[in-house]
Structure formats: C-alpha cells, structure tokens
C-alpha cells in the first residue's frame, strides 16, 4: 500500500481513507521507532511528515486527527495508537508541541460525558493504552487533572479484573488489555489491581496455552474446547503480548515478564514473518 506523504496526507488526514486513520498510526508506531534507533535521516524525515500532520490537525476544542463518529460518539482508538507515536517522537526530539497537543487532547477527553466515552468495542477494550499515555504525560508535566482523567479512563474501560468472565476473548485484546488493571495499580496502589493482570495472564495460558512459544490457542478468538495445536495466534497478538510484557516488567520489576517476552520473541514471532520482513502470516499455529 502506498504510504507516500503526498497520497497519504490526502487520504488519511483530509478524509477518512480506507479504514479511518488507524492504519497509518500502526505503521508509524514501528517505523518511527526504527528510524530513531537507526538514526536513519531519510526515515526520520518521512516520519516527521506524519508527525507534523498530526500536530497541525489539532482542533480548537483540543481534539486532533480526523473525526470519525459512530452513533454521535467520536472514535478514540486510532488516536491511542498515534499518541504512542507522538510520545516516541518527543523522547527523540524534545519537541514541546507534543506536550501541548497531548495536554489539550486530554483536557478534551475529560469533558466527554462517561456515557459517550470509550463506547466503541476496540477503544473500550483497549483503554489501558490511553491510560498509559496519560501517565507518560503526567510524569513529565505533573498536571493534576491527568490523574482525574486516569480514573475516568479506568472506570470506562472494559473490566479485565474478572478472570471468570473476560470482556471478550479476542486474542489481540487479551494480549494487549490484560495489563490494564496493573497499569491502574500505579495510581490506585491496590494490590488487587496488580494481581488481576497476573491472574488473567495465567488463566489464559492454563486453558488455552498448552502450546510452545509463550502464546495461546485462539485463532481470532479463544474458544472453549478449541485448545489443540491447530489453534494459533495472530501476529498482532505476538507483538502486543511482547509490548505488554515489556510494560509489565517496567511497572513491576518482575523478571517473569522479561522471560515471557523472550519466549514469544524467539519462539513464536520469527515463524510469523518472512526473513525479509516484507510479509507476515495472519495466524501462526504450532501444528
């Protein structure tokens, strides 16, 4: 797919494009980080085109990016991905416009009524990513309203604390969202929040994880009785699990998460991508 700035800016920032604007932030999230790590000037220049477009898309009310409404509610999931892109860019560049943009955007989020906040399936499942970005900004600016927003995000995000009745069994959501209670623990200080993330992780492996490589049998969704080696996990699930493991390690200091990340990275992920990284499998199964 052509992601050149001349085509992409028109499709993604001026119009909704093929899939809202989720696709570009997903790509940029990895591309930008690679650019900064490799210090590749051409990649950094291309990354900045998209970063500049995001910053310049800020609206008077604090919202940024294309407006994609569902039932009168603004969809927030794609913005969560773009926030991580902006955070990486700030850590590389120190560009304070990122802090201004995120501060204004989070102030806007605080004005949205609870009954119109995190209502869509994806954003409701994955509100923990938004919460993590709020912490990131708070640790730089220390603005107290961010903690109020953190509480609002937690109470409106799907409940990942109930191991007997998960909000959904989508493999990527499980890999990405099980850490939300532990993320909230950083504010609440309630050990029950921290332990909930451990319990969900172990529950899924106990029921669906009798496969090598650190993941679990799910295909698209984990289903009871479908637990043999013919069931697999999406490549997206591998990536989000590794990200969650890294974040859990950062929050807890528990080497268990480093070991689990290594298990997925070296035993599952390589089989999901071509050697040149130009193609990938949607689902990878042990057998």
Where do the PLM segments sit?
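Single conserved hydrophobic/aromatic residue that forms the stacking wall/gate
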Residues: 2-9, 13
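Extended ligand-binding groove/face enriched in aromatic
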Residues: 14-17, 35-154, 160-163
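Well-ordered alpha-helical segments within folded domains of soluble proteins
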Residues: 20-36, 74-90, 123-139, 170-186, ...
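Short, solvent-exposed turn/loop segments enriched in Gly/Ser/Thr/Pro and often Arg
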Residues: 23, 65-71, 75-78, 121-130, ...
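Proline-centered turn/helix-capping motifs that create local helix->coil transitions or kinks
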Residues: 55-63, 97-98, 141-148, 192-193, ...
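Extended ligand-binding clefts on enzyme/binding-domain cores
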Residues: 140-148, 152, 166-183, 187-195, ...
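Extended polysaccharide-engagement surfaces of secreted carbohydrate-active enzymes
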Residues: 194-195, 205-287
């Amino acid at each position: 797919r052509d992601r050149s700035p001349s085509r992409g800016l028109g499709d993604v920032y001026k119009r909704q494009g093929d899939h809202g604007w989720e696709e570009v932030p997903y790509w940029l999230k990895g591309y930008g980080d690679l650019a900064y790590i490799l210090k590749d000037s051409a990649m950094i220049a291309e990354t900045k085109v998209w970063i500049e477009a995001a910053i310049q898309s800020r609206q008077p009310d604090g919202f940024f990016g294309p407006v994609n409404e569902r039932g009168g509610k603004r969809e927030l999931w794609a913005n969560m991905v773009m926030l991580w892109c902006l955070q990486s860019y700030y850590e590389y560049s120190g560009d304070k416009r990122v802090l201004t943009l995120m501060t204004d955007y989070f102030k806007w989020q605080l004005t949205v009524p609870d009954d119109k906040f995190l209502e869509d399936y994806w954003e409701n499942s994955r509100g923990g990513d938004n919460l993590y970005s709020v912490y990131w900004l708070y640790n730089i600016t220390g603005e107290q309203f961010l903690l109020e927003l953190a509480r609002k995000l937690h109470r409106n995000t799907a409940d990942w604390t109930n191991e007997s009745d998960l909000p959904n069994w989508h493999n990527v959501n499980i890999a990405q969202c099980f850490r939300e209670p532990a993320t909230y623990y950083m504010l609440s200080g309630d050990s029950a929040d921290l332990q909930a993330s451990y319990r969900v992780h172990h529950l899924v492996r106990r029921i669906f994880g009798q496969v090598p490589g650190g993941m679990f049998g799910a295909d698209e969704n984990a289903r009871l009785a479908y637990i043999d080696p013919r069931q697999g996990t999406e490549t997206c699930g591998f990536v989000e699990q590794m990200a969650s493991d890294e974040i859990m390690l950062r929050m807890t200091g528990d080497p268990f998460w480093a070991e689990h990340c290594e298990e997925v990275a070296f035993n599952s992920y390589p089989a999901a991508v071509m050697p040149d990284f130009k193609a990938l499998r949607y689902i990878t199964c042990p057998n």
